[in-house]
């Protein structure tokens, strides 16, 4: 059996047929270079998945790949040049249902004053004409029983703010813009209405593409969305697939050819599939753009426009974003019709107020020692998880090696890691087997790991928006969190913006940081510090995750 023969066990589709059994991994199983000295991640394949060997041993390079971009991932450039925008005659297109919302009696009788009070309490603002009232309970949302049973099985106490307002908006069939912080529950805000939408459409015929298309910026976010879709679409036997770069195309092509109601995709790989004729978007009537701001930041706008040009214009479109910059507004005005909008929280760039922000002004040479001091305190609690952000892939590997040599079970994730290594690292971090993860900015969005208690900015990012996205990995879903930032004179030009963020969130501010705001320019040159300190060095840094852990400190 060739590994990936199927992969989505059970389930089947609304029209019958299952995904079959099968494993995960193709015949060749292991990672390139994984068998030079035995061991390594994957080793030699046994034909059934990740192959023998452990995630240790010598050798084993992790080249290639790409993480939401780069070689092996979503290539850019001329991508989509083979796609022609479709000409649509609306009158000749098959009609479809998209309006399913029926206001619950309790919602209907709720006064305007009560509605306004609810919106104020949840920092909710709306825009557009005839925006439906928010719902306050799951029952008020009016989902069919097959959806509600799955929701209640998860044990959620009540809808989140974005769900309260977003569900009636999405179920009404209108085009929707939702602005809310990461971790606010927006995935379910569009997932559950999509299930209702799918079940109101004709069954897929052979050769049909998906009914629901979700575009996401990174593989990790795409996989997270797929997990939610699987969970809540199970009772409706809705089939889905995840289409992203950095892995073999064969299994994704197989899923698409068998027929799926839902396709979750990164733009680059989806365009590959469309150009190769492996799927089409003629049946798409429910389009979701998730983390639209991040997709534009990553340069996907031309690809998004190419993809939307393949979809009928009377579709329902839902756009979700953590921020509302002019680039996202322009995309919304081009592709959404008479849309209604909900914003949760301030429209200004602001940090989550449940996060305690600690900013220390240090020299470059002091950073490693300060990081260790914080680690010792944080990891006193064995339940804690810490995500460490660095500026480059090289530093990610250097810091990971340094931490492992110092006795800390750290692993790194960045754009030069193969997809199966990234998946393994994420799983180790999620399960707490390795509670310390070092990441570049490419991981600052789209990775949904619950219960991250601490974020440490070893290197400060290029702008305050990325700072807010980074620290937003903690303090999610109502929890408290802590963000620690090591700030050097090299970051001086960012000082004023950072002080503004800290003041807005009513945080304590290091007087030395305030002092920096009084001087312009880029600050001093710092002290370098590459490969210094305990166990530094760059030799063989690409193999940092295989580095043996020294005398354990955790």
Curated annotation (Swiss-Prot):
Entry's Gene Ontology BP terms: nuclear-transcribed mRNA catabolic process, nonsense-mediated decay; rRNA processing
Subunit structure: Associates with polysomes.
Protein name: ATP-dependent RNA helicase DBP2
Gene: DBP2
Residue interval(s) of motif Q motif: 136-164
Helicase C-terminal domain sequence ranges: 357-517
Composition bias, Gly residues: 1-24, 36-47
Region of interest: Disordered: 1-47
Pfam families named in the record: DEAD, Helicase_C
Catalysed reactions, as listed in the record: ATP + H2O = ADP + phosphate + H(+)
Domain Helicase ATP-binding: 167-342
Domain of life the protein comes from: Eukaryota
The keyword Nucleus appears for this protein: yes
The keyword Nucleotide-binding is assigned to this record: yes
Biased composition (Basic and acidic residues): 25-35
Region (RNA-binding RGG-box): 519-540
Localization in the cell: Cytoplasm; Nucleus
Annotated domain remarks: The Q motif is unique to and characteristic of the DEAD box family of RNA helicases and controls ATP binding and hydrolysis.
